[in-house]
Regions:
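Cytoplasmic helix-loop-helix junction between adjacent transmembrane helices
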Residues: 107-143
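C-terminal transmembrane helical hairpin of 12-TM major facilitator-type secondary transporters
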Residues: 277-322
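Helix-loop-helix hairpin linking two adjacent transmembrane segments in secondary transporters
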Residues: 139-187
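Juxtamembrane intracellular "pre-TM" segments in multi-pass secondary transporters
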Residues: 2-7, 188-216
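Extracytoplasmic gate region of multi-pass secondary transporters
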Residues: 31-32, 212-254, 261
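A late C-terminal transmembrane helix in Major Facilitator Superfamily
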Residues: 333-366
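Conserved MFS/SLC helix-loop-helix module at the cytosolic interface between two early adjacent transmembrane helices
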Residues: 62-97
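Cytoplasmic membrane-interface "Motif A"-like loop-to-helix N-cap segments
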Residues: 73-83, 272-285
């Protein structure tokens, strides 16, 4: 049974998943370097244009738990196909003639993401060995980060050639291709799922609401606040305050997800060998604020750019640990890991909703980015709390056995 469960076909499954992860990332942050263009097009404020990110994350936040339930009931294979189709919503961008319609398109995309993220966790847990989970989470997150980096890198140059509407349309093609490929070749691991008892919402509520889940969720919120808030507004800050051309400013900020994309697999491999998760969370919580502050406070743009790159590197360490911990909690199965992951990500995404709106609105009010950036930069300290009080779930936990989750 074990040989069948962990067959070599799992790497084909991972390759198909990667296409969808890159497509997700490509569309997720691609509107952010285009904020000035979209603001001029629709004559809207910074706080309004922030909705293109915040509204997306709102629907992700609201839909994550229902998405986890959908996966448990419908199966990971069909759920991932639906997710890919929804994530291709940017194909409709040229049909929009108002900002409201553009926001609606982003909401549909967010629904797809809310299904795809927990479905990905469920599929990985179905197909891969426990010792491979950190590495696979690193590879998967690398695909998302690579997509984000490419989207932020090329959005402005492509817009200069074909316009922002056609740029977003072209980005919407990849998730649709990924959905088609997955529909043709993707499948659930029957040998894994048939070993589990029937899914019960009541049995899984303790996993979603226990103290460990809430601690990890609080840490997730801190890291997401910095990643999304700074990715959204640093291009505009560099352009407006430091006079850097928007295209170059976007390239600088794109180094954040690019570093994460490059280092996520390395982080996964190291954490597979290390066998510990708590030190990763604590270290990330202590260093993210330092590099976030450096990205806009230091006068040297070279040093600020290095800080942006370091933000991406530290985020790669955090995200691999944060996505692996739910898979290692005692009693969590492939049918329920989507729900646990969704519960953790819900708070993280809520912070992602608030962060860009907070920065945009407070900047409009104060006429300066400094205060909102400083506040957001300190939020990742919640990771230190999570790192201190979470039990160790890695293979090198006390006596080699993960500590049980506490209610």
């Amino acid at each position: 049974m074990q040989e069948e469960q962990y067959s070599p076909h799992r790497w084909v499954i991972q390759a198909m998943l990667m296409l969808l992860q890159v497509g997700m990332g490509l569309n997720f942050m691609s509107p952010t370097p285009l904020f000035p263009v979209i603001m001029d097009e629709f004559e809207i404020s910074r706080s309004a244009v922030s909705l293109l990110v915040s509204a997306t994350i709102i629907v992700i936040t609201v839909a994550l738990l229902p998405g986890g339930l959908l996966i448990a009931k419908m199966g990971s294979r069909r759920s991932m196909t639906v997710a890919g189709v929804l994530m291709s919503a940017h194909l409709l961008t040229p049909l929009t003639d108002s900002f409201i319609l553009l926001v609606i398109i982003r909401l549909v995309f967010g629904m797809g993401v809310a299904i795809a993220i927990p479905a990905t966790s469920a599929i990985i847990m179905e197909w891969f060995k426990p010792s491979e989970l950190p590495l696979l989470n690193g590879i998967t997150e690398s695909g998302r980060s690579l997509g984000v980096a490419v989207g932020v890198f090329v959005a402005v140059p492509v817009t200069n050639l074909i316009g922002w509407e056609m740029t977003l349309l072209s980005f919407g093609v990849l998730p649709l291709i990924g959905a088609f490929v997955w529909m043709m070749g993707g499948r659930s691991n029957v040998s894994s799922t048939t070993l589990e008892p029937p899914f019960s919402i009541r049995d899984n509520i303790p996993f979603m609401l226990n103290g460990n889940t809430l601690l990890l969720a609080a840490g997730m919120a801190g890291a997401f606040a910095v990643f999304i808030g700074f990715s959204s507004w640093l291009p505009a800050y560099y352009n407006e305050v430091r006079g850097i051309p928007l295209e170059r400013a976007s390239l600088v900020v794109a180094l954040l997800p690019l570093m994460a994309a490059v280092l996520n697999p390395v982080s996964g491999l190291i954490q597979s060998r290390l066998g510990k998760r708590k030190p990763m969370l604590t270290m990330a919580g202590l260093t993210l604020p330092v590099f976030a502050l450096g990205s806009f406070l230091v006068p040297s743009q070279i040093i600020a750019t290095v800080c942006v790159m370091c933000l991406g590197a530290i985020f790669s360490i955090f995200i691999v640990a944060a996505l692996t911990i739910p898979m290692e909690l005692p009693g969590v199965k492939s049918s329920s890991v989507g729900l646990v992951t969704a519960a953790v990500l819900t708070m993280g995404n809520f912070a992602g909703v608030v962060s860009p709106i907070f920065v945009g609105s407070l900047t409009d009010f104060l006429g300066s980015y400094t205060v909102p950036f400083c506040i957001i930069a300190l939020v990742p300290l919640t990771l230190v709390i999570a790192g201190l009080f979470l039990p160790e779930t890695g293979k090198r936990a006390t006596n080699g056995i993960p500590k049980p989750a506490t209610s």
